[in-house]
């Protein structure tokens, strides 16, 4: 089997549903034979490792551990789902304090054991703030750490495809930006449905509002249907993000990235933007939309600022003007 690289990929939270799916997806896509599975729950991560062995992936070197020093040492790529999952009735923001404390420790492990890591993807919620926490603590460059945000856009794409009875790939330029949560901003002014602008499809305002609501509540809908939070879609998209940095297909769905941009008017947050991930990391451009879309994005940014300020007040990260002491790259 041919692999993109032989460098070490670390899956954090590998004993869980997302983590185990990430491990299998990474090996099925041929990212690297050297995959380390890490979790604090030994029976879970041991069980996942055994299942991976039973898949008999050609040339694979799968290891597992509950020791962070062993796990993080020499890791060049990391995906972390190592936080508490969302349960029915919870918002992503409800997970803020506990998961940001986990993210702080995660960032500290990176700084201590694998400062030469190439790219890190954080996918445990609230992803914008856990990723920001990890970035501050890790010392990495902003281009080296991203958070999963693509699911909001793929859910929008899926909802529009179902609405108009077209293959999902025929819905283009349907994106969400800003926060990965209730305050996400939906951008559809440039959306095409099989080549036809959405604005020309005679969609009523009421129906469009329903589609937007279904997009924002897409994760909650999965919990109600399956009794647990999403795991297959986040696992696949997170692995595709890492694949892009390894030199595979560029990842062009929106990713959460660090934004400190006077031109954009957004300062010191992680948020979903128009992005590309490639071997040089993540790059963003300024979003373009209608005045209404830009107002939604501004509101989403302000919500992210409030969550950022909350983790500062909790002492999980230092005040913004002291971030450079923790991470000179910010």
Region spans (language model):
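Conserved S-adenosyl-L-methionine
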Residues: 28-34, 139-142
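Conserved N-terminal Rossmann-fold NAD(P) cofactor-binding segment
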Residues: 6, 31-75, 309-311, 316
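A short, basic/flexible loop-to-alpha-helix module at the beginning of a structural domain
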Residues: 1-7
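C-terminal substrate-binding/catalytic lobe of Rossmann-fold NAD(P)-dependent dehydrogenases
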Residues: 138-143, 153-330
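N-terminal Rossmann-fold NAD(P) dinucleotide-binding loop
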Residues: 19-20
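Rossmann-like NAD(P)(H) cofactor-binding subdomain of soluble oxidoreductases
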Residues: 91-159
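Rossmann-like NAD(P)-binding element
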Residues: 55-119
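Conserved glycine-rich cofactor-binding loop
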Residues: 15
